[in-house]
Amino acid sequence: MRGSVMFEYALEVHEEPGSVWLSCAEIPEMHAAGDTLEEALDGAIDAMETALSIYVDDRRLIPTGDAGEQESDAVLRLPALTAAKVGLWNTLLESGVSKAELARRLGVQRPQVDRLVDFLHHSKIENVERALQQLGRRILLSVEAA
């Protein structure tokens, strides 16, 4: 796919007696743990979304993940909404458009734009898509065999 971003992150599995924890070299702020690998993986999305929030708070670009290029113990694929929010956040930073300006273009209040890049808030993907369109971007979605 031309110019596509995968939003797949290579995870390292660390095992200790009675527990497992996960880390991600691309997003070092991400850590998930559990009694088993399955439990740790179950919490990995929440842990990743919390870690991505740190990038927004610090006004940093978010690495977009390309696990296919790396050796890894496990792979974390972002949900569609989370991936769209990463795309929106990175586009805002790269374009230099402020949240206030995006709010003006969308005809909404600034707090609504804040929520569009808040990984802990469940936005409607249509609203993220509309914001991306205002920035000259679009969402591409593909479905493939697991």
UniProtKB/Swiss-Prot annotation:
Q: Which domain of life is it from?
A: Bacteria
> Quick check: keyword Mitochondrion in the entry?
no
Do you know which Gene3D superfamilies this protein is assigned to? 3.30.160.250
Q: Does the keyword Cytoplasm apply?
A: no
Keywords, sorted A to Z: DNA-binding, Repressor, Stress response, Toxin-antitoxin system, Transcription, Transcription regulation
UniProt GO MF annotations? DNA binding
Family membership noted in the UniProt record = Belongs to the HicB antitoxin family.
Q: What biological function has been recorded for the protein in this entry?
A: Antitoxin component of a type II toxin-antitoxin (TA) system. Functions as an mRNA interferase antitoxin preventing effects of the HicA toxin.
Q: How does it assemble?
A: Probably forms a complex with the probable mRNA interferase HicA; when complexed with HicA inhibits the toxin activity.
Q: What is this protein called?
A: Antitoxin HicB
Provenance organism: Pseudomonas fluorescens (strain Pf0-1)
